């Protein structure tokens, strides 16, 4: 197969599948679904949107923390491809902020979101199928485009899944998250928050 033909087609496909793990795609989708839920007075859709935001934030923090602690080089790094390269694939904690391969943030975010969405609509099988398919396409695209090693994507997807499951379980426990009341309190001793649910 012609490498240029393969690279150009894979690049075109992964450009569209990577978007499912992008912050600039996920955050407007969360805002949009919350707005639709508010306009239609759909409490479950509003709750799901807030839970997806929780999952997104947890996945983002976990991904950033692990990337800084592992400092793994990406497969697309031209230096790592050279057989005589002195650059190790794992550089260790805080070695560099340029080696951010492990884990895949796209996979973690997309699976955290997919798991949360599917968890709020367990009776609608198609919701889970569509959500997990989008997450899987995003994750596979990261490997195919040589942005991540396969292990980066597998670990990112697994962590995203468990983050999403945890958020769904927590939200099922507290019930209607949109009824949560958060108040800021300012005193002479400092600032604080009170959360009532």
Task: Identify the role of each PLM range.
Residues 36-62, 66, 128:
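Interfacial segments of alpha-helical transmembrane regions
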Residues 80-196:
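Membrane-embedded catalytic cores of phosphoryl/pyrophosphoryl-handling enzymes
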Residues 24, 28-31, 48-51, 55, ...:
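Alpha-helical transmembrane segments of integral membrane proteins
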């Amino acid at each position: 197969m012609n490498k240029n033909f393969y690279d150009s087609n894979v690049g075109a496909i992964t450009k569209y599948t990577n978007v499912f793990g992008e912050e600039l795609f996920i955050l407007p989708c969360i805002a949009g679904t919350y707005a639709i839920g508010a306009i239609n007075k759909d409490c479950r859709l509003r709750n799901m949107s807030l839970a997806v935001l929780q999952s997104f934030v947890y996945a983002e923090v976990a991904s950033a923390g692990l990337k800084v602690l592992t400092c793994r080089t990406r497969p697309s790094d031209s230096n790592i491809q050279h057989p005589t390269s002195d650059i190790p694939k794992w550089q260790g904690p805080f070695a560099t902020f340029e080696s951010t391969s492990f884990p895949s943030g796209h996979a973690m975010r997309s699976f955290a979101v997919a798991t949360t969405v599917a968890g709020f609509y367990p009776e609608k099988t198609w919701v889970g199928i569509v959500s997990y398919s989008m997450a899987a396409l995003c994750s596979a695209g990261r490997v195919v485009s040589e942005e991540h090693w396969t292990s980066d994507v597998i670990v990112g997807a697994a962590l995203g899944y468990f983050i999403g499951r945890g958020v769904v379980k927590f939200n099922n426990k507290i019930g209607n998250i949109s009824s949560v009341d958060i108040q800021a309190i300012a005193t002479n001793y400092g600032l604080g928050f009170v959360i009532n649910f």
